[in-house]
Amino acid sequence: MIAIHDIKKHYVMGDTVIRALNGVTLDINRNEYVALMGPSGSGKSTLMNILGCLDTPTSGTYTLNNTEVAQMSDDELAEVRNKEIGFIFQTFNLLPRLTAWENVAMPLVYAGKKRQTRYDIAMQMLEAVGLGDRANHKPNELSGGQRQRIAIARALVNSPSIILADEPTGNLDTKTSIEIMQILDDIHRKGNTVIMVTHEEDIAHYAHRLVRLRDGILESDTVNKPTQMQK
């Protein structure tokens, strides 16, 4: 499903070249559950942006579902971001003036769905994450955990095959973090590929595979043992 080969990403800042990624090669198969870890500046967020087609590498190849991403047009990339990949962000990225269901339905607007269809699908997603009774609440009327559930529902609304979660529990307390990870577990069991950035070891062990980055290179790629995984 995902194959990146010798990916490099360099930024020029004044006279300095920042080597965010320096030759990363990685394959991720359909229905894998992968955690990306590394210290600040390791390149994990840069890699996540490239995997999500939000950024392009300086060199190297990225193949998604047997298609080289560099060969895709802007319209094709937009369709991939809207339909093939669901994004979950640490800061939720909800629109403050919209209700919960309207936030969940935003990807359906870009997909050209009619309002009633958007509402029906958004309500199904909100029910799936336990927030059907909060459909008409705005983000400032909800807790952090509830906002993250809305973000998860939004990520699922177009039935993407890949979920990219960037520090999905970073702003949450321990109890709420466990609840969110249980939802991600369920998403994976239903057949989605889940790729998650986290700096928390206990959260990383929900994944079946742990990839560590350091200084822009792949430091290790290991399989989590069943005894390590928190259920």
Kindly give the residue locations of the regions a language model identified.
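ABC family nucleotide-binding domain
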Residues: 1-213
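Conserved beta-strand-loop-alpha-helix hinge in the C-terminal portion
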Residues: 209, 217-231
